[in-house]
């Protein structure tokens, strides 16, 4: 029988909140007896918006805004039913996007 694996991808704009959430997931999975790989930092996605400062004139005067999306990857190898239940009950901050694949 092939080993079952749960892959969790986390995304957030704040890296501190993201790391705290990843630590909670790793701690919960280790406590329930599953093997963990990660958290693996993935490349940070940068989105830059350039806006003209003036409403009418002076096109050369511009302002740039940047939005960074930080990402982490956690693999849970051979999870137990207790691991899955505890991960479902886990309370994470609202600023973290979670994508789970079985």
From Swiss-Prot:
TM stretches of this protein: none
Give the protein's recorded name. Answer: Small ribosomal subunit protein uS10
Q: Which family does it belong to?
A: Belongs to the universal ribosomal protein uS10 family.
Q: Which organism is it from?
A: Limosilactobacillus reuteri (strain DSM 20016)
PROSITE patterns per the record? RIBOSOMAL_S10
Its function, per the record, reads: Involved in the binding of tRNA to the ribosomes.
Note the HAMAP family from the entry. Answer: Ribosomal_uS10 (MF_00508)
**UniProt entry keywords in alphabetical sequence:** Ribonucleoprotein, Ribosomal protein
């Amino acid at each position: 029988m092939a080993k079952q694996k749960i892959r969790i991808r986390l995304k957030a704009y704040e890296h501190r909140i993201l790391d705290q959430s990843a630590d909670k997931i790793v701690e919960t999975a280790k406590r329930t007896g599953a093997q963990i790989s990660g958290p693996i930092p993935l490349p940070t996605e940068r989105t830059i918006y350039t806006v003209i400062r003036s409403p009418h004139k002076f096109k050369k005067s511009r302002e740039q805004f940047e939005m960074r999306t930080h990402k982490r990857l956690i693999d849970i190898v051979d999870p137990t039913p207790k691991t899955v239940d505890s991960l479902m009950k886990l309370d994470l901050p609202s600023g973290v996007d979670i994508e789970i694949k079985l």
